Amino acid sequence: MALPNQQTVDYPSFKLVIVGDGGTGKTTFVKRHLTGEFEKKYEPTIGVEVHPLDFFTNCGKIRFYCWDTAGQEKFGGLRDGYYIHGQCAIIMFDVTARLTYKNVPTWHRDLCRVCENIPIVLCGNKVDVKNRQVKAKQVTFHRKKNLQYYEISAKSNYNFEKPFLYLARKLAGDANLHFVESPALAPPEVQIDLAAQQQHEAELAAAASQPLPDDDDDTFE
């Protein structure tokens, strides 16, 4: 099925909707992929930029048509036209801004109201910033809703490919799918050293082993 500004191609392609509060880094994240940035198209009727992001797997090429909100979430909710025919999604929050995480359930609800049973990745962005406000142990929404969670840093390219690989495996129904070459990414604007990466991963592993809180509100101590 061809979507607006989406030509028919002879390899699998999927509409990927990216949602989250304004300023969480959604546009920065998508623009790291240089080919997608070069070939983006604007869809004026809905007010989005559509970025075609190509990845090369052991099963061949796949394309994600990434729908970026162009900042209109700052003026309230998004129109249903943004979500319709969405086949997968990324919900993004900013680990340096607590409110953006508290709003994740609202984005998830709006998304699932239109797109039922699609694979969804929750991404905590800006882990390169030292004084994060949302710690790994406080991120529990994905466990309650059975979503995949990754911590990323758009500006450093840290974990850039992981959300796309997870979604590709889910959409293809193949857990052994893997990328055979890296996409061309913009040079990192910041660096995350190996020790910091290992610390992030250790904190995530520790958080995953903790029991879930009883209440629905994720607490911030």
UniProtKB/Swiss-Prot annotation:
<dbReference type="InterPro" id="IPR001806">
    <property type="entry name" value="Small_GTPase"/>
</dbReference>
<feature type="domain" description="Small GTPase Ran-type">
    <location>
        <begin position="10"/>
        <end position="174"/>
    </location>
</feature>
<feature type="binding site">
    <location>
        <begin position="153"/>
        <end position="155"/>
    </location>
    <ligand>
        <name>GTP</name>
    </ligand>
</feature>
<feature type="binding site">
    <location>
        <position position="71"/>
    </location>
    <ligand>
        <name>GTP</name>
    </ligand>
</feature>
<feature type="region of interest" description="Switch-I">
    <location>
        <begin position="40"/>
        <end position="48"/>
    </location>
</feature>
<keyword id="KW-0539">Nucleus</keyword>
<dbReference type="GO" id="GO:0005794">
    <property type="term" value="C:Golgi apparatus"/>
</dbReference>
<dbReference type="GO" id="GO:0009506">
    <property type="term" value="C:plasmodesma"/>
</dbReference>
<keyword id="KW-0342">GTP-binding</keyword>
<comment type="similarity">
    <text>Belongs to the small GTPase superfamily. Ran family.</text>
</comment>
<feature type="region of interest" description="Switch-II">
    <location>
        <begin position="71"/>
        <end position="87"/>
    </location>
</feature>
<protein>
    <recommendedName>
        <fullName>GTP-binding nuclear protein Ran-3</fullName>
    </recommendedName>
</protein>
<dbReference type="GO" id="GO:0009536">
    <property type="term" value="C:plastid"/>
</dbReference>
<dbReference type="GO" id="GO:0003729">
    <property type="term" value="F:mRNA binding"/>
</dbReference>
<keyword id="KW-0547">Nucleotide-binding</keyword>
<comment type="subunit">
    <text>Found in a nuclear export complex with RanGTP, exportin and pre-miRNA. Interacts with RanBP1a and RanBP1b. Interacts with KPNB1.</text>
</comment>
<dbReference type="GO" id="GO:0005525">
    <property type="term" value="F:GTP binding"/>
</dbReference>
<dbReference type="GO" id="GO:0005634">
    <property type="term" value="C:nucleus"/>
</dbReference>
<dbReference type="Pfam" id="PF00071">
    <property type="entry name" value="Ras"/>
</dbReference>
<dbReference type="InterPro" id="IPR002041">
    <property type="entry name" value="Ran_GTPase"/>
</dbReference>
<feature type="binding site">
    <location>
        <begin position="125"/>
        <end position="128"/>
    </location>
    <ligand>
        <name>GTP</name>
    </ligand>
</feature>
<comment type="function">
    <text>GTP-binding protein involved in nucleocytoplasmic transport. Required for the import of protein into the nucleus and also for RNA export. Involved in chromatin condensation and control of cell cycle.</text>
</comment>
<dbReference type="InterPro" id="IPR005225">
    <property type="entry name" value="Small_GTP-bd"/>
</dbReference>
<keyword id="KW-0653">Protein transport</keyword>
<feature type="region of interest" description="Disordered">
    <location>
        <begin position="201"/>
        <end position="221"/>
    </location>
</feature>
<dbReference type="GO" id="GO:0003924">
    <property type="term" value="F:GTPase activity"/>
</dbReference>
<dbReference type="InterPro" id="IPR027417">
    <property type="entry name" value="P-loop_NTPase"/>
</dbReference>
<keyword id="KW-0813">Transport</keyword>
<dbReference type="GO" id="GO:0006606">
    <property type="term" value="P:protein import into nucleus"/>
</dbReference>
<feature type="binding site">
    <location>
        <begin position="21"/>
        <end position="28"/>
    </location>
    <ligand>
        <name>GTP</name>
    </ligand>
</feature>
